[in-house]
């Protein structure tokens, strides 16, 4: 069961068959993410494969990981399976049970 962890807090956890892996990034279904640790960011980027990405700051115990998570609300057709799914980076570790 993959989970995203930052500063000792589990941010997301889902069954292996529920996550999506695209270009090496593990995308979690939105209902598997603890949104209490996410704060909307104004950052937007464009990926040629997936389209526009919107970001969240990850906030744990007043520590902020700026733009530490992102999602594609309306991805391009090649990546439509990740619409709304959330992935992490910038020190957020993805752990896997054996």
Whereabouts are the PLM-identified features?
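Terminal leader/tail segments of proteins
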Residues: 1-98
């Amino acid at each position: 069961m993959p989970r995203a962890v930052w500063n000792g807090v589990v941010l997301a956890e889902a069954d292996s068959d529920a996550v999506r892996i695209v270009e090496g990034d593990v995308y979690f279904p939105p209902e598997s993410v603890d949104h209490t640790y996410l704060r909307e960011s104004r950052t937007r980027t464009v990926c040629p494969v997936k389209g526009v990405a919107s970001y969240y700051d990850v906030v744990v115990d007043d520590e902020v990981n700026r733009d530490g998570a992102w999602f594609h609300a309306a991805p391009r057709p090649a990546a439509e399976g990740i619409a709304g799914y959330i992935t992490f980076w910038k020190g957020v570790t993805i752990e896997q049970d054996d």
